[in-house]
Amino acid sequence: VLNELAVGLSAWIIQDGNYGEFQKGQRAPFALEFYNETSLRVAEHRGDAFMRRESGSFYQARGRVTHISEDWWAMDFGIAAFQNAPPPEDVRPGTWLEGRVYIGIDPFFYFEQISHSGDAPDMIHDWIIERIEMQTAPFVDAGENRMVRDPTLSGWREIPQTDAWSDDNRSAEYLLHCRRISETPRRALVADS
């Protein structure tokens, strides 16, 4: 069972009002979202789900598809994560996939929308934020009016808390080093008392 992760967080998620600022030592409930820049491959070895961190919040991962819907799907990589996009056409529940994935905090898709559909799996866990880092690479022009982080200067600086309205001219990218503290997932951000 996977209990410690480095989870990506973009400043806009806080700026949209979906979460408050985060600080070291804080307890925070959230689901995990994943995305992949290239298609995931059908896994030849289907026995063990895993996530091995490469850098930032990117992982080499293998997992089992647990849920398919028309416009989102979920996988178990040792911990559940969802993708707010139509699933690949050839994928069914039980299919094992592997490849490089980004793991981030659920911006709002799960807790505001997906969790309200009757067959959605429970995906929100409680986490302790053990450390916070902020990306230090400057933005460079990628053409076509797009700015991206300079990959040759990628780096992280530890900070005690996020400040989404000020950090990096409101464009900060954070890395939350988290430890999962709840065993049983749920659908709501606030646990029933």
Show the residue positions of the predicted features.
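OB-fold and OB-like single-stranded nucleic-acid-recognition modules
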Residues: 9, 26, 30-34
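Short, surface-exposed beta-strand/loop "edge" segments at domain boundaries and coil↔beta transitions
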Residues: 80-86, 178-193
